[in-house]
């Protein structure tokens, strides 16, 4: 069992009955140490939760909790991890051992702590001192609100709400208007200097690479069948199944391949994404399909198939292609391409928020950045236009999502890259607006947060 899954599934506590002597709302700090990583934990008895401090916070209720006098133990029936400890009334602390899924015991002690001293527990430990124009770095111009037509009142209200934790686990907010960065703020112990996992925002980067490959004549347009670009072992076995599928079907999520990435949470074996860990997920997936062109079905394997097409069509590894054709021309140096699978395919990568902004600003400028045409302008328009409706006011292009917002009594179009947990690049061409957000909303609804932030604050802030 994956250690992180087992750990995060355990990290929540029911209230300790009988502790009675503790002052109201005390917090306990502990560190769970593995050879390769240290997990900082905060126990909040009043809220009955154990928080993981850092970039992946979570809390999940326990199935079992026992207390016999000062002996404390908790576990979860469907996991093989648990904790046993002893509460010491004199020190007001808890000492014990965490037993993980391979039966290894690890000492874990909790001591009383002021959470305000623990960075990462709250959105901001040191209060904001007021608005400041972001620093000029790496070719991204910066301007004050007054020079780009932004209402400072709405921005200040939004930042206050982020400071108060009204939008949980939003770690970054960057706003660019009329080609200049005007807002750059970070929360929950993140400062923007490190690369952040962008999850399925990676798909929109692959869309850009596809447009470049089409312009170079390496692949055809949307009607090009994928069969001729698949690895040889698939051409023989699944040619009759894959033959009708085109690049259009791949990038618009209409392949007809049976896949359910929505009904069950990620990590649940019933979620089709679990197939991605199989020895040969493509072969398993192609065994069941409907005719391509069927209604939209979000499918991360489509992204992997597109990577395969590009690798075979360009003659470049996916790593070489994305680095030489996209990241380097954008001046992006601090990145992580993540783990490649045994087929050499890139899943999701990590970028700094500012570098995500560069990508969004390039698309706003029809594929041009710093005087260089990186992505064909025609492809920017093609890939970000709606190809298939998803639900009310939500559509999908070629690895880009589409929506509209209300602005001054009319609707303005928006396309956006969207990754699990709250990773976003929003582009609103009519307002010359680009917004980047990163988050760790693994168990909440980041779509609701992001839409509220955009519709209630950032879009109407544009004068």
Where in the sequence are the language-model features?
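Bacterial Sec-dependent N-terminal signal peptides
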Residues: 1-24
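Catalytic-site signature segments of enzymes, centered on catalytic residues
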Residues: 192-195, 262-347
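Structured C-terminal helix/loop/strand segments within mature extracytoplasmic catalytic/sensor domains
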Residues: 417-463
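Active-site Gly/Thr loop motif
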Residues: 333-334, 381-434
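N-terminal leader/targeting segments and the immediately adjacent pre-domain N-terminus
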Residues: 16-71, 78-190, 216-220, 252, ...
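Active-site helix/loop module of the DD-peptidase/beta-lactamase fold
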Residues: 216-257, 287, 314-351
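Active-site SXXK
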Residues: 179, 197-222, 250, 306-310, ...
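Active-site-proximal alpha-helical segments within enzyme catalytic domains
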Residues: 302-309, 347-368, 423-440
């Amino acid at each position: 069992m994956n250690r992180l899954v087992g750990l995060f599934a355990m990290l929540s506590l029911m209230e300790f009955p009988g502790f009675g002597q503790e002052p109201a709302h005390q917090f306990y700090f502990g560190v769970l140490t593995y050879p390769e990583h240290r997990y900082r934990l905060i126990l909040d008895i009043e809220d009955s939760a154990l928080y993981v401090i850092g970039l992946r916070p979570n809390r999940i209720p326990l199935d079992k909790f026992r207390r016999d006098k000062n002996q404390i133990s908790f576990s979860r029936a469907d996991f093989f991890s648990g904790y046993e400890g002893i509460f010491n009334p004199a020190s007001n602390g808890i000492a014990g051992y965490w037993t993980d899924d391979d039966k290894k015991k690890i000492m874990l002690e909790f001591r009383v702590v002021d959470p305000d001293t623990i960075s990462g527990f709250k959105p901001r430990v040191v209060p904001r001192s007021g608005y400041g124009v972001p620093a000029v770095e790496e070719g991204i111009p910066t301007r004050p609100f007054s020079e780009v037509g932004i209402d400072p009142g709405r921005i200040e209200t939004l930042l206050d709400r982020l400071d108060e934790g009204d939008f949980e686990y939003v770690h970054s907010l960057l706003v660019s208007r009329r080609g200049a960065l005007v807002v750059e703020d970070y929360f929950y112990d993140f400062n923007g200097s490190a690369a952040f996992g962008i999850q399925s925002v990676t798909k929109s980067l692959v869309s850009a690479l596809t447009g470049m490959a089409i312009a170079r004549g390496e692949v055809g347009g949307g009607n090009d069948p994928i069969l001729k670009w698949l690895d040889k072992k698939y051409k023989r076995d699944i040619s009759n199944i894959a033959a009708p599928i085109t690049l259009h079907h791949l990038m618009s999520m209409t392949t007809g391949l049976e896949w359910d990435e929505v009904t069950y949470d990620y990590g649940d074996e019933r979620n089709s994404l679990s197939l991605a860990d199989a020895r040969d997920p493509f072969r398993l997936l192609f065994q069941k399909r409907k005719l391509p062109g069927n209604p939209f079905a979000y499918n991360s394997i489509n992204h992997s198939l597109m990577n395969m097409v590009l690798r075979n069509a360009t003659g470049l590894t996916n790593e070489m292609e994305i680095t030489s054709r996209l990241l380097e021309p954008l001046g992006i140096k601090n990145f992580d391409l993540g783990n490649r699978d045994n087929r050499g395919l890139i899943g999701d990568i990590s970028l700094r928020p500012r570098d995500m902004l560069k990508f969004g600003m390039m698309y706003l400028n029809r594929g041009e950045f710093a005087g260089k045409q990186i992505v064909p302008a025609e492809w920017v328009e093609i890939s970000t236009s709606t190809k298939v409706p998803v639900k009310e006011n939500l559509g999908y292009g070629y690895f880009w999502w589409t929506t509209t917002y209300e602005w001054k009594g009319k609707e303005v179009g928006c396309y956006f890259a969207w990754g699990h947990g709250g990773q976003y690049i929003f582009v609103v061409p009519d307002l010359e607006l680009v917004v980047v957000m990163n988050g760790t909303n693994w168990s909440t609804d980041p779509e609701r947060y992001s839409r509220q932030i955009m519709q209630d604050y950032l879009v109407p802030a544009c004068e």
